[in-house]
Amino acid sequence: MKKRHTVNTIKSAKNSNKLVMITAYDALFAKLFEPIVDMILVGDSLNMVFAGRSDTLSATLDQMIYHANAVCSGAPSAFVVLDMPYGTYINEKEALQNAIRIYKETDVDAVKLEGGKEKADLIKTLCQNGIAVMGHIGLLPQHVRGQGGYKVVREADRLMEDAKALEEAGVFSIIIEGVKPEVAAKVTDAVQVPVIGIGAGKETDGQVLVWSDMLGFFEDFKPKFVKQYLNGAKLVKEAVSQYAKEVKEGSFPSQEFSY
């Protein structure tokens, strides 16, 4: 059995072992991923993947807690990070109340929230109260409506300031999204905590992908940075089509599958 990660072992992976992170929203897939990856992210992307919404903004804290518990049940030895959904960390008081609720009602190891140096004081408050925090800079999905879409972030100086401010505030790692590889590499070198990339090139300390993207289940849209390791949608459609065909023609269930 693989040794369970902690905040300290994640931090110690900086400049040594590439960290592998993947999303999961249920016990079934979490159990499959647990022995392979370093971290599982219960991302607010579930609002799009699981609930079929157009963005992440309407995900609720109740919804996130429900899925976090499913993931923790399926992967009890995994290092699990939970996204704090939009609107749950508007100020320090609300952020702390909601983060404490997450820790009380789930077994997740850490929370993740979006934002740069403007969130540093808030993050510091969480960390001082025993909450492990993963930062998220660059392209911020929770800001997609206000920014007019998903756009690559090019301001290197701002990203460096953001990363350093989050590190000083106490994050144990940072996700950097939608950033040119050379910029992400500079940010990674500038801080002592692991930087996990998504659409940010290969010079970060690790990578994270949405499981349904990398396994080819999400057919509506494929981001440029996603490599599909499986055409899951095609395989599922073929299998269900074969099942439907056998039911229609009366060949299933055969004697082999009957009591």
From Swiss-Prot:
Its cofactor is Mg(2+). GO terms for cellular component: cytoplasm. It comes from the Bacteria. The active site is at residue 177. InterPro entries: Pantoate_hydroxy_MeTrfase (IPR003700), Pyrv/PenolPyrv_kinase-like_dom (IPR015813), Pyrv_kinase-like_dom_sf (IPR040442). It catalyses: 3-methyl-2-oxobutanoate + (6R)-5,10-methylene-5,6,7,8-tetrahydrofolate + H2O = 2-dehydropantoate + (6S)-5,6,7,8-tetrahydrofolate. Homodecamer; pentamer of dimers. Catalyzes the reversible reaction in which hydroxymethyl group from 5,10-methylenetetrahydrofolate is transferred onto alpha-ketoisovalerate to form ketopantoate. This is 3-methyl-2-oxobutanoate hydroxymethyltransferase. It comes from Nitratiruptor sp. (strain SB155-2). The gene is panB.
